[in-house]
UniProtKB/Swiss-Prot annotation:
Disulfide bonds: none
EC number(s) on file: 3.1.3.71
Pfam families noted in UniProt: 2-ph_phosp
Co-factor requirement: Mg(2+)
Swiss-Prot/TrEMBL catalytic activity: (2R)-O-phospho-3-sulfolactate + H2O = (2R)-3-sulfolactate + phosphate
Keywords noted in UniProt: Hydrolase, Magnesium
Organism in which the protein naturally occurs: Clostridium botulinum (strain ATCC 19397 / Type A)
GO molecular function: 2-phosphosulfolactate phosphatase activity; magnesium ion binding; sulfopyruvate decarboxylase activity
Name of the protein described by the UniProt record: Probable 2-phosphosulfolactate phosphatase
Enzyme's top EC category: hydrolase
Similarity remark: Belongs to the ComB family.
UniProt cross-references to PANTHER family, sorted A to Z: 2-PHOSPHOSULFOLACTATE PHOSPHATASE-RELATED
Length: 239
């Protein structure tokens, strides 16, 4: 199995994704939100690029819609929820559709539509993601959503942890140089939050008093669910 990493949503080569399995990572916080919502019984998540698109879907849909997302880490005016995974509890999302628009994560998803399979991962479900990947027997591209088109330490070290989880299942991994680097960084910094504390995006969230979000997002493997993008929606994968 060949594994490569893309460092941000802006670095995605859409043609290069054809017939590939893609893993989208945005641990702070979009993929943590999606994984949490699906785990709490959300019917589906619709990832969109713009605020206007999200509001149009909510206006024209007959389904029970929750609008969620952020711009510059802040809740969007007129939306039900921000990009905090702690808001997407079973009480509020069970049986409902979440329309999500974020600065980085939903853009990475929308830029990956050429892929054969798109799975959603974060620290909170990395082991479950690794098990699903193992069943697919396909080359893998891990896409880090990044921060405003730039490299993001938090997504990168999460990629390293996901690779480590895969190594615990199978040994026939062929890593690109960047994938080797991510794995090396993780294996030498297994206390991920401590390593990430000086990162730009981490500091931004902390400045907004989102310490509880950070604490939640840096937990490993508290969820055994893998969301999958399919036919316009993100649902619970049956892989």
């Amino acid at each position: 199995m060949n594994i490569d990493i893309v460092i941000s949503a802006d670095h995605i080569d859409e043609k290069g994704l054809i017939n590939k399995t893609v893993i989208i990572i945005d641990i702070l916080r979009a993929t943590s939100v999606i994984t949490t919502a699906i785990n709490n019984g959300c019917k589906k998540v619709i990832p969109v690029l713009t605020v206007e698109e999200a509001k149009d879907i909510a206006k024209n849909s007959e389904e029970d819609i929750i609008l969620g997302g952020e711009r510059n880490a802040l809740k969007i005016d007129g939306f039900n929820f921000s990009n905090s995974p702690l808001e997407y509890t079973k009480k509020y999302v069970e049986g409902k559709t979440v329309v999500l628009s974020t600065t980085n994560g939903t853009r990475a998803i929308n830029n990956s539509f050429n892929a054969k399979t798109i799975l959603i991962s974060a620290l909170i479900n990395s082991k479950a993601t690794a098990k699903a990947i193992d069943k697919l027997h396909e080359d893998l591209i891990i896409i880090n959503s990044g921060t405003n088109g730039q490299f993001s330490i938090d997504d990168f070290i999460c990629s390293g942890y996901l690779i480590d989880c895969l190594y615990n299942i199978r040994k026939d991994l062929e890593l690109s140089d960047i994938a080797k680097t991510a794995h090396y960084i993780y294996t030498n910094n297994k206390d991920i939050e401590s390593f990430v504390k000086k990162a730009t995006h981490y500091s931004r969230l902390k400045s907004l008093n989102l310490e509880k979000d950070l604490e939640y997002c840096f937990q490993k493997d508290i969820i055994d669910v893998v969301p999958q993008y399919k036919d316009g929606y993100i649902i619970k994968s049956n892989i």
